[in-house]
């Protein structure tokens, strides 16, 4: 076991640090060598052993074998690609679809330059960033849900 050092709350240096919100690691058990040298490797090796044990004792099958001669009627990507898939599916010009996909990260990069984000952490005091986030989330959900529907209903989600 490591040496446990009790805090001296009468120490003016510690009191000054605690008043500033610092100095919480001034006392207690040191992380080196006890935690970093002995406990962390045991935890990491234990986690690896559990994963290997589960993989050996209970292997899960990935799915049914692929049949290259049977193609489904509509191929859908993974769920996190639904909005991008919907953009490519509905825009008639593929170059325009690719430009729309590139404009999303480019637009997100410009948001910090539109307003001074470093000054405030409250989202209500950053209206441009909050508006971009809310509109982007709504559009992404709209496109993601529309990608699961047939092409005729995909833009209106079958509501209109």
UniProtKB/Swiss-Prot annotation:
Residue spans crossing the bilayer: 36-56, 95-115, 131-151
Gene Ontology MF: a single term: ubiquinol-cytochrome-c reductase activity
Any one annotated GO CC term: chloroplast thylakoid membrane
InterPro entries xref list: Cyt_b/b6_C, Cyt_b/b6_C_sf, Cyt_b6/f_cplx_suIV, Cytochrome_b_C_euk/bac
Signal peptide extent: none
One GO BP annotation of this record: photosynthetic electron transport chain
Pfam families, per the entry: Cytochrom_B_C (PF00032)
Topology within the bilayer: Multi-pass membrane protein
Localisation: Plastid, Chloroplast thylakoid membrane
Stated family: Belongs to the cytochrome b family. PetD subfamily.
Record text on subunit structure and interactions: The 4 large subunits of the cytochrome b6-f complex are cytochrome b6, subunit IV (17 kDa polypeptide, petD), cytochrome f and the Rieske protein, while the 4 small subunits are petG, petL, petM and petN. The complex functions as a dimer.
NCBIfam families linked to this entry: cytb6_f_IV
Chain's role: Component of the cytochrome b6-f complex, which mediates electron transfer between photosystem II (PSII) and photosystem I (PSI), cyclic electron flow around PSI, and state transitions.
The protein's name: Cytochrome b6-f complex subunit 4
Native species: Lotus japonicus
């Amino acid at each position: 076991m490591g040496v446990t050092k009790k805090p001296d709350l009468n120490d003016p240096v510690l009191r000054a640090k605690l008043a500033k919100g610092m100095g919480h690691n001034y006392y207690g058990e040191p992380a080196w060598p006890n935690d970093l040298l002995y406990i962390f490797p045991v935890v990491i090796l234990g986690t690896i052993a559990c994963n290997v044990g589960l993989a050996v004792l209970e292997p899960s099958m990935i799915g049914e074998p692929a049949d290259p001669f049977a193609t489904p009627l509509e191929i859908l990507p993974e769920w996190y690609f639904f909005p991008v898939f919907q953009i490519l599916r509905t825009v008639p010009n593929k170059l325009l679809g690719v430009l729309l996909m590139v404009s999303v990260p480019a637009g997100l990069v410009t948001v910090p330059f539109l307003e001074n984000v470093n000054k405030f952490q409250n989202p209500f005091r950053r209206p441009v960033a909050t508006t971009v986030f809310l509109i982007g989330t709504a559009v992404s959900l709209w496109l993601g849900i529309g990608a699961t529907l047939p092409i005729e209903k995909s833009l209106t989600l079958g509501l209109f």
